[in-house]
């Protein structure tokens, strides 16, 4: 299975940006940790990473995933979580599972950070666990996709399914 990981604005500055909140781990290290998690778990997963500081590029990347071989999206939209209805709309039209990740617990931060338009459009939100949150999202995504596949196979093999009885 192929999973797209989208990283939003300022995440390229992890390791330098407010270490008290975000720690010293860089974005590249987070991606390496995710790849190691895939290998150690013998998961049949291919990850593609994309980072941008531009809202439109995030929307473009989500739209490019429509009809592609990406089965799911893990996204940290950064500050766009609190402002971007356009990214939320793109998430809703993606037609695949999307999980939002935040390194910090946005509910415990400034009032303006507590609302997440994008999180409301996602199947789930993982926040406050630092870099571990990405592996948590990855684990959830793998399970969601496996359940979806099992359900589809069960539907295809069900002799009572009217679609299977068409001639």
Curated annotation (Swiss-Prot):
The record marks 17 as: Transition state stabilizer. Pathway: Metabolic intermediate biosynthesis; chorismate biosynthesis; chorismate from D-erythrose 4-phosphate and phosphoenolpyruvate: step 3/7. Its EC number is 4.2.1.10. InterPro entries: DHquinase_II, DHquinase_II_CS, DHquinase_II_sf. The keyword Lyase applies. One of its GO terms (molecular function) is 3-dehydroquinate dehydratase activity. It catalyses: 3-dehydroquinate = 3-dehydroshikimate + H2O. Belongs to the type-II 3-dehydroquinase family. Homododecamer. Catalyzes a trans-dehydration via an enolate intermediate. This is 3-dehydroquinate dehydratase.
């Amino acid at each position: 299975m192929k999973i797209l990981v989208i990283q939003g604005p300022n995440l390229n500055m992890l390791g330098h940006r407010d270490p008290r909140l975000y720690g010293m781990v860089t974005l590249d290290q987070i991606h390496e940790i995710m790849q190691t998690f895939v290998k150690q778990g013998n998961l049949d997963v291919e990850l593609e990473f994309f980072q941008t500081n531009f809202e439109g590029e995030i929307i473009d990347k989500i739209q490019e995933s429509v009809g592609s071989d990406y089965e799911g999206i893990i996204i940290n939209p950064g500050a766009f979580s609190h402002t971007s209805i356009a990214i939320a709309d793109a998430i809703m039209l993606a037609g695949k599972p999307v999980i939002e990740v935040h390194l910090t617990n946005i509910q415990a931060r400034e009032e303006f950070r507590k609302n997440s338009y994008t999180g409301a459009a996602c199947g789930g939100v993982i926040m406050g666990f630092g870099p571990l949150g990405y592996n948590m999202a990855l684990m959830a995504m793998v399970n969601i996709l496996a359940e979806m596949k099992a359900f589809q196979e069960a539907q295809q093999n069900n002799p009572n399914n009217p679609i299977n009885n068409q001639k």
